[in-house]
Amino acid sequence: GLPDHIAWIKAAGEKYPYMDMDRVGIYGCSAGGQESTTAVLLHPEFYKAAYSACGCHDNRMDKIWWNELWLGYPVGDQYKEGSNVENAHLLNRPLMLVVGELDDNVDPTSTMQVVNALIKANKDFELVVIPGAHHTMGEDFGEHKRYDFFVRHLQGGIPPEWNAITYR
């Protein structure tokens, strides 16, 4: 889980001093999208920004057979405690949520539920919906968005003007 990831990254930072432990971002898709959101909600002291694509943000609404493998049966408090919807009010780090309009693996409603909870909690975040896309990290457009997001929030820089870039 995330505590193990944090311990590993800190150990790597000790071995490789060029790693900046004050600017750690995280991204993921599907279960990784869920976990990257969880990272900034529950471990904001370590993770400074998250790009989360197509995550199932509440395991009570996903494929229950899949979740029972990891969280057990019956559906109990462990499902609620791990819900990004329930924990949305904790957000205090930059978060970009990305979802494919036609995702047939993780229902886009899962992302919209966390969006609704963030709005109700008056939290600032970014949302990118990719029209016509399925279960995706964001395709080419999402790659630009992810790059720009981390340049802004981890480097404090200004992303390039993508439309002005020419290739030889």
Language model features with spans:
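Active-site-proximal cap/loop segments of hydrolase catalytic domains
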Residues: G1-R168
